Regions:
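Mature N-terminal segment immediately following signal peptide/propeptide cleavage
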Residues: 29-68
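Hydrophobic beta-strand positions that form the internal "hydrophobic ladder"
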Residues: 60-63, 110-114, 157, 247, ...
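Blade/loop signatures of beta-propeller domains
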Residues: 22-39, 75, 201, 206-208, ...
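A flexible loop/linker signature enriched in serine peptidases of the S9 family
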Residues: 24, 48, 67-80, 95-102, ...
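Short loop/turn segments that connect beta-strands within beta-propeller blades
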Residues: 85-89, 129-133, 208-211, 271-275, ...
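Bacterial Sec-dependent N-terminal signal peptides
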Residues: 1-25
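Residue-level detector of Asp-centered blade-edge/turn motifs that repeat once per structural unit
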Residues: 58-59, 108-109, 152-153, 242-243, ...
């Protein structure tokens, strides 16, 4: 009987995989390109895959990463995920389908890999085993999500979702359902190639139970600004504390013309137990960005520009002591930008990236200095 059940389960698994492949067939032939010349033609350039993102396994032994390929004839691109050991061995492809997918990340226990995909029709969270098998949908959130991040203890998930705050022309004139007009009476009504549509990205917190994400709590309820900030902001602007009890994020809590002309964003800490939000960068008038918590919970570091309205200011590192509430300008004597902050495991150093002599290099700042 057990053998019959096992065989049935295997058959169902292969049926599910086959159906998924039929629904989202790969548009990229994953064969090795054989170059017959050292001339870099447009066709050769477009045949190369572009690495999009990566995540290191909790045990530090392997890396999962995304590669985007393009099909010139179909004028389409396809992203797939790969895994490789940190010593460069055992490379394997985990996915091979044309559904939109991004945000690949390891679960804190290292047993599964999560990402966002539109495989179900809208963007939702999915998980698979480290070998690419046992793909499962994790979330069934109304209207979908745009990203998510596991808490360090693996018990909760924060996810991002668009929330309607402002009224649109259809709300005001419900007798004109087919109208495509926009009512504009203030800035900021458009950012580059994107219209302001009355929807704002908010942070939701959900329990993560039995590998499922439930409808979460909106910690920014009623707020008419985006978290993360547009146009460049991503999930890196939002991070968990090491004890999974707090969330740090950066945003610009302004509206209208003030939002359009100011770059004065702030760093906020949200406490899950008290549901209170604290501004820890108050008095800093420039662009505060991408806060990260130290593993020991003692510090929060972020990048900062000094002056409001000046988008080309030097990007500095500030470190906030969660006990004393003091802030330190860490890179005061470093005459370059600093980005991509990462704490060392012992919380004694911060690694960051800076451009020097037309190259991007990795630097380290030691707190003891």
């Amino acid at each position: 009987m057990k053998r019959i059940l096992l065989i049935s389960a295997v058959i169902l698994l292969f049926i599910n995989i086959s159906l998924a492949q039929e629904k989202f067939p790969s548009i990229i032939p994953f064969d090795e390109k054989k170059l017959t010349s050292d001339i870099m033609t447009p066709e050769v350039l477009w045949s190369f895959g572009r690495i999009t993102e990566m995540s290191v396994a909790p045990d530090g032994k392997s890396i999962v990463y995304g590669v985007r390929y393009f099909n010139i004839q179909m004028n389409k691109g396809q992203t797939d995920f790969f895994k490789i050991n940190t010593d460069g061995t055992n490379k394997m492809r985990l996915t091979g389908s044309s559904d939109a997918k991004f945000g690949v990340k390891w679960r804190p226990d290292g047993k599964r890999i999560g990402y966002v995909s539109n495989r179900s029709g809208i963007m939702q969270a999915w998980e698979m085993k480290p070998d690419g098998s046992d793909l499962r949908q994790m979330s069934y959130i109304s209207d979908g999500i745009s990203e998510f991040k596991y808490s360090p203890d693996g018990k909760k998930v924060l996810y991002l979702r668009e929330v309607k705050i402002d009224k649109t022309v259809h709300d005001i004139y419900n007798d004109l359902p087919k109208s495509n007009a926009r009512i504009i009476d203030d800035l900021m009504y458009r950012h580059w190639d994107e219209w302001e549509d009355g929807l704002y990205s908010h942070i939701f917190i959900s329990d993560y139970i039995s590998e499922n994400i439930k409808d979460g709590i909106d910690i920014n309820a009623g707020e008419g600004w985006d978290i993360p900030m547009k146009p460049f902001g991503g999930i890196e602007q939002i991070n968990w504390s090491s004890d999974s009890k707090k969330i740090v994020y950066a945003t610009k809590k302004m509206r209208g013309k003030e939002y359009a002309v100011s770059t004065n964003s702030e760093v906020y800490v949200y406490d899950l137990s008290t549901k209170a939000t604290e501004n820890i960068s108050e008095g800093m008038m420039g662009f505060e960005f991408a806060p990260v918590c130290s593993p020991d919970g003692q510090y929060i570091a972020w990048t900062s520009m000094e002056r409001d309205g000046y988008e080309s200011d030097k990007t500095r590192i500030f470190i906030y002591n969660t006990s004393t509430k003091e802030k330190v300008y860490a890179t005061k004597d470093f005459d370059q930008n600093a980005d991509g902050l990462e704490w060392s495991k012992d919380s004694k150093s911060i690694y960051f990236v800076s451009g020097i002599r037309a190259t991007q290099e990795i630097f380290r700042y030691d707190l003891a200095d």
